[in-house]
């Protein structure tokens, strides 16, 4: 199926201070935005797609100057795709604190004339949602037909339905969770520790030293990447295969160089990530993941936390996702059904672990296509 083709991002500047959950505020900030499709006259066909940890506003299509830079959810969004841009106006927003053009640690702090670095304020999922709401205001969108996201993006979609219930028709939460488990927080802490202990980190102000803490960022990515894959998927892809040149003896080298194919793969992923991502951003986003817990204000009662929601929900999980296991999605489903919300739940049998939400799986995409067709019918009614 064809891509949406060449797209171009644009930068929105906001001068009104954004109050943050930590008590501080951003006096002025930029958000990178990308749109696909056409907003109808009633402004009723808009869908917001929220991104996960290392993604951005570039949801679909390609850039004219870099045709290899394909949008991170290009198989989901586009003409004739499950989220059909012939029917919907789709918005992607790069979150505050990211490193892809929105205001973040790499941006210049107007108070000092230097990059924010470690001084950039800690942000939360709720802060992102409030910033995204201002983007919607700029487009004159008072209500989204749907807000959708996978993983961390799913947390944002859920937060939208709780913080702005009157502005969300459908909330689509994929491979996500209403809060991180202790195990997930632990993985994030180990990843952050790898970055913080890198000699090139310099307390987060490594820009002034013209270096990057690549060693720490590389290890952080390797840790994270393991959690995105299932055991079965890793066994099928790599097994215990040794990394050897064609025709070489299939025997151990008895040293600490790369021996196994899975080691080579993880190092490749770590190296690639360290080349394009920012370490301070990684710290910020993983901490935002840790802090997300809308039930906390209700003494841990998720049912109470979702009491004032009004959206219809599609919640999808994957059988082999152990990062955000199906049990976490079922917990959310139960809380919503306790209030008799309209909920569609699908637990998809897929071997690819957490990353399954990014892949072109027929059952998964058929589910999304059918659900968006239902939304399109509502929009056109």
From Swiss-Prot:
GO molecular function: homoserine O-acetyltransferase activity; homoserine O-succinyltransferase activity
KW Acyltransferase (keyword) present: yes
Chief location category: cytoplasm
Gene Ontology cellular component terms for the protein in this record: cytoplasm
Subcellular location as annotated: Cytoplasm
Residues noted as binding substrate in the record, renumbered to the chain: 221, 355
EC number in record: 2.3.1.46
Claim: Nuclease is one of the keywords in the record: no
Reactions listed under catalytic activity: L-homoserine + succinyl-CoA = O-succinyl-L-homoserine + CoA
Active site (catalytic residues): 151 (nucleophile), 321, 354
Residue span(s) of domain AB hydrolase-1: 45-360
Pathway stated in the Swiss-Prot or TrEMBL entry: Amino-acid biosynthesis; L-methionine biosynthesis via de novo pathway; O-succinyl-L-homoserine from L-homoserine: step 1/1
Site entry (Important for acyl-CoA specificity), positions: 323
GO biological process annotation, one example: methionine biosynthetic process
Domain of life assignment: Bacteria
Keywords (A to Z) from UniProt: Acyltransferase, Amino-acid biosynthesis, Cytoplasm, Methionine biosynthesis, Transferase
Gene3D superfamilies cross-referenced by the UniProt entry: 1.10.1740.110, alpha/beta hydrolase
Subunit relationships: Homodimer.
Family stated for the protein in its record: Belongs to the AB hydrolase superfamily. MetX family.
HAMAP family: MetX_acyltransf (MF_00296)
NCBIfam families per the UniProt record, alphabetical: homoserO_Ac_trn, PRK00175.1
Protein role: Transfers a succinyl group from succinyl-CoA to L-homoserine, forming succinyl-L-homoserine.
Entry protein name: Homoserine O-succinyltransferase
Source organism of this protein record: Paraburkholderia phytofirmans (strain DSM 17436 / LMG 22146 / PsJN)
Gene name tied to this protein: metXS
């Amino acid at each position: 199926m064809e891509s949406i083709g060449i797209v171009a991002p644009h930068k929105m500047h906001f001068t009104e201070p954004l109050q943050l959950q930590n008590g501080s505020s951003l006096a002025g900030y930029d958000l990178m935005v990308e749109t696909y499709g056409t907003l109808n006259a009633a402004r009723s066909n808009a869908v917001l797609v929220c991104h996960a940890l290392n993604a951005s506003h570039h949801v679909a299509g390609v850039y004219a100057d870099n045709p290899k830079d394909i949008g991170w959810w290009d198989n989901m969004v586009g003409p004739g795709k499950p989220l059909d841009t012939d029917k919907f106006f789709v918005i992607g927003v790069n979150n505050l604190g990211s490193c892809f053009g929105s205001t973040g640690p790499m941006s210049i702090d107007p108070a000092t004339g230097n990059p924010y670095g470690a001084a950039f304020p800690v942000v939360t999922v709720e802060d992102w949602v409030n910033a995204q709401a201002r983007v919607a205001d700029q487009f004159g969108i008072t209500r989204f037909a749907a807000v959708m996201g996978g993983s961390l993006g799913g947390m944002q979609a859920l937060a939208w339905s709780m913080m702005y219930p009157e502005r969300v028709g459908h909330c689509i939460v994929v491979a996500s969770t209403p809060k991180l488990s202790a195990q997930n927080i632990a993985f994030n802490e180990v990843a952050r520790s790898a970055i913080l202990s890198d000699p090139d980190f310099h307390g987060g102000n490594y820009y002034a030293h013209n270096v990057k803490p690549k060693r720490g960022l590389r290890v952080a990515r390797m840790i994270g990447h393991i959690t995105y894959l299932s055991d079965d998927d890793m066994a099928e892809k790599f097994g215990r295969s040794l990394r050897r040149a064609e025709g070489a003896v299939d025997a151990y080298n008895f040293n600490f160089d790369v021996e196994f194919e899975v080691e080579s793969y993880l190092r490749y992923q770590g190296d690639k990530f360290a080349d394009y991502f920012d370490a301070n951003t990684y710290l910020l986003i993983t901490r935002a993941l840790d802090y997300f817990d809308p039930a906390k204000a209700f003494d841990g009662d998720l049912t109470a936390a979702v009491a004032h929601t009004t959206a219809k929900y599609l919640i999808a999980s994957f059988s082999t996702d152990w990062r955000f296991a199906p049990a976490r999605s079922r917990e959310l489903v139960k809380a919503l059904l306790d209030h008799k919300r309209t909920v569609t739940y699908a637990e998809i049998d897929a071997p690819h672990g957490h990353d399954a939400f990014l892949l072109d799986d027929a059952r998964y995409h058929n589910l999304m296509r059918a659900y968006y067709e239902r939304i399109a019918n509502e929009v056109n009614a």
